[in-house]
A protein has these predicted regions:
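Short strand-turn-strand beta-turns centered on an Asx-Gly dipeptide
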Residues: 171-177, 278, 319, 344-345
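Bacterial Sec-dependent N-terminal signal peptides
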Residues: 1-22
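N-terminal carbohydrate-binding accessory modules
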Residues: 245, 315-344
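Short glycine/proline/serine/threonine-rich loop/turn segments at secondary-structure transition edges
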Residues: 152-155, 195-200, 297-311
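Beta-strand-rich binding/interaction modules
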Residues: 170-172, 256-288, 294
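Surface beta-strand/loop "capping" patches
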Residues: 238-267
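Accessory beta-strand-rich segments of carbohydrate-active enzymes
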Residues: 23-34, 52, 56, 71-75, ...
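Short, aromatic- and glycine-rich surface loops/edge beta-strands on solvent-exposed regions
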Residues: 202-205, 308-319
Length: 345
């Protein structure tokens, strides 16, 4: 019995320590922890919302913006970063405030650096992959409470970070959620087990100026850190279209069109696919009942060109769900023939 109690005490002590001592930022074998699978950028609206664009999604009941003021702490050296900021009783009253999205160097935290070739640390650190400097490796730490709609109860809730440089560690309500690198890619996390709809929820994350992934991000550009793109929460039905990838093409000597549609479903339920033109007229329909590929044919569609960028809207819905996923598509064919790149022949 004493051994059991001792083991329990050790485990209780180890849990918070484990949440503060991550090494992913210098581990080349790990570029994500608990990150949701990458997917196409399609947003699920509710029936009747009629959204089709990034701007429209902000008016959807499935969307909750994370833009705005966040409590913010910035340190010059990674060794000086706070390690217990994710605790619910942490006192952040002495912290600054920063806008999200927001680049540190454009808000007075560090200096923007332009590098054509090589790495921004080259004057004070000898490259030794996967290790990156601790000194001058700035770290920004964010905290904010977010009221999650009570109407999201029973939904699956995700966080979307459009671009965070160079990485992100994420906590919700005092619990570690996950990690992501790949700073110019979107990172999404399933927050369903951590959030409480109808209540204020504490979201915390920490960002390093450099991580091991920075060795692969040494292109000719300004080196800037922080949150560079839109961030938000979004709600989804449990039974849903998790991903839809649409590839348009032209056939029959560039006359007719075909859509190759790749669906990822969380449940094998019928899916209805409807293609409408710019005036809202239905021009083709299709269906699917499981994850995988399907096709839709369109007779003599309007072609997409740079001069006439005509777009159709493909709408996908699943039986038993009031989610509507619109995808803009244009029919074109790009080919390399001889020494020329041809569009639509």
């Amino acid at each position: 019995m004493k051994k059991i109690l001792l083991a329990g005490a050790i485990s209780a002590l180890a849990a918070p320590l484990a949440a503060q001592s991550f090494k992913e930022w210098q581990d080349p074998e790990i570029n994500a922890v608990n990150r949701a699978p990458m997917r196409s950028e399609a947003f699920a609206f509710r029936k009747g919302e009629n959204g089709t664009s990034k701007t429209d999604r902000q008016n959807s009941s499935n969307y909750l913006s994370l833009k705005g003021d966040w409590k913010f702490n910035w340190v010059n050296d990674a060794s000086s970063r706070p390690t217990d900021f994710w605790k619910k009783d942490f006192n952040d009253k002495g912290w600054d405030t920063i806008k999200v999205p927001g680049i540190w160097e454009l808000n007075g935290y560090g200096d923007p650096i332009y590098v054509n070739t090589g790495y921004a640390w080259r004057n004070h650190f000898s490259s030794n992959p996967p290790e990156v400097p601790t000194a001058d490796n700035h770290v920004g730490t964010y905290r904010r409470e977010i009221l999650v709609p009570a109407s999201w109860k029973g939904k699956e809730i995700f966080a979307h970070f459009g671009s965070v440089t160079s990485n992100i560690y994420l906590w919700v309500n005092g619990k570690y959620v996950g990690y992501s690198e790949d700073s110019k890619l979107e990172a999404e996390f399933d927050l369903t087990p951590y959030l409480i709809p109808g209540k204020e929820n504490l979201i915390c994350f920490q960002v390093f100026r450099w991580c091991d992934g920075s060795y692969l991000e040494d292109q000719d550009f300004w080196r800037l850190s922080g949150v560079g793109r839109d961030c938000y929460l979004f709600a989804r039905d449990k039974n849903r279209i998790a991903d839809i990838r649409v590839t348009p093409d032209l056939t029959d000597n560039y006359t007719d069109g075909v859509l190759d549609i790749d669906l990822t479903l969380t449940a094998n339920k019928p899916v209805t696919l409807t293609l409408t033109d710019a005036a809202g007229n239905t021009v083709a329909t299709g269906s699917a009942s499981k994850s995988g590929k399907t096709t839709m044919s369109v007779s003599n569609p309007n072609k997409w060109t740079a001069e006439t960028p005509y777009l159709y809207t493909l709408t996908a819905t699943m039986d038993g769900s009031d989610e509507v996923i619109p995808v803009k598509v244009g029919f074109r064919k790009i080919e390399l023939k001889g020494n020329q790149i041809l569009v639509n022949g």
